[in-house]
Structures are given as C-alpha cells and as structure tokens.
Amino acid sequence: MLSVPPPRAIRAIAALLLLALAGCSTVATTRTGFLGSYEELKPDSKDTRRLAFEKTEWKKADFTHVTFEPTVVHFSPKDEKKITAQESKELAAYCDAALRKAFEKSFKPGETTEAKSLRIRAAVTGIDTSSPGLNVVSGLLLWPMDYGGVSLEFEVLDAASGERLIALVGFSQGTPLQVIGSFSRFGHARSGIDHWVAELHKTVRPAQTKTASN
C-alpha cells in the first residue's frame, strides 16, 4: 500500500508549490523621464532602493509654504497591463492625500509673495499587485507569499524660480511582516507610498520629522 505523507509534510509541499506560483515583484528604481534629468541623482550606500539628489546648503527654514502638482502615473507598457485606469487614478489620489497629510503639518498651503514656497511633483512609476486569493490560501498553510510593490519619483522645487532642490527615486516591496497589506491588491503599494512620502518629508524637514516620530 502507498503511504500517505503526514499533514505537516503535505502543508510543506503545498507551501513550496504556492511559493513557486507566487509572482516575484518587478518593482525597481525607475528613470521614466518624469524628472527630466537624472544625472544628479546618486545611489544611497545605506539603502539600495533609492537614488537621491539634494542641493547643497539650501535654506530650508526660509520656505514656509507648499504647493502640490497632481500626482501622475507614469507606467511602462508592462505595468499598464497590471492595473485599470480607475485603479491608476485611485493610486495617484492616494499619493496626493499622503503628501498633503505629511507636508501640511509643516507648511502652509499655497504660494505667497511674502515668503518662499516649495512646489512638489510626484509620479507613481512602477506597480506590482498582491494576489489576495493566493495569499489567503498560502496564509492558511504558512504565510502570505505574493507581495506587491511600488516605484515612485519625486521632485521638490523652489516655486518661484523653478530650481530643483530635491529629487528622490525609490521603490518598496511587500514583506511577510506586512500581513494586512497582503490581502489587498494595492496594500503593499499604499504602504510603499506612505514610506517614500515620509522619506521625502524627512529630507525637507529633518528636525520636525524626528520630533514627530519621538
């Protein structure tokens, strides 16, 4: 008679099969043309997920106001097939809201002739979705295995002169620790947007970001 593997072995085999079926994330740092020029951006030795530029010794305290250009979606043809037009609009709107939430705590909205203003540009440039159905099954056996992700490009300008002060390109991929995000197609992407908006704000207002996190 053929012996039946124990339940633990069956679960392990099923988990390996699910892992093989789960899609690998394809998000990475991008150079879509949204920023116009990328020559100034340099790798970060502490974080391989980012490229960044910051103007030397610009007077951050002089800027008290902020304006935002609407976030755009700048996907490759491959990524465009992963997401509907409505979902693209919703991701852009999520990024808009995240930027306003982060920066309007530190800056007054709008431009003024009495003080310096920043203008922030943002683009969602890469996307990878999670598979909630696959993650429900794999979560019952072991843990969610299909992780989403997002790539973004940001630019901070002097609103009056148009001079570039900061440019940031980054990407995030979901992890096994982000369990809740695994059960939404864009849960990991939204977490990535939150992360990179916080990183951008940290660069613009490092002291305030540190104080707020304490």
Which residues fall in each region the model found?
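Second-shell loop/turn segments in exported
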Residues: 79-90, 107-109, 179-187
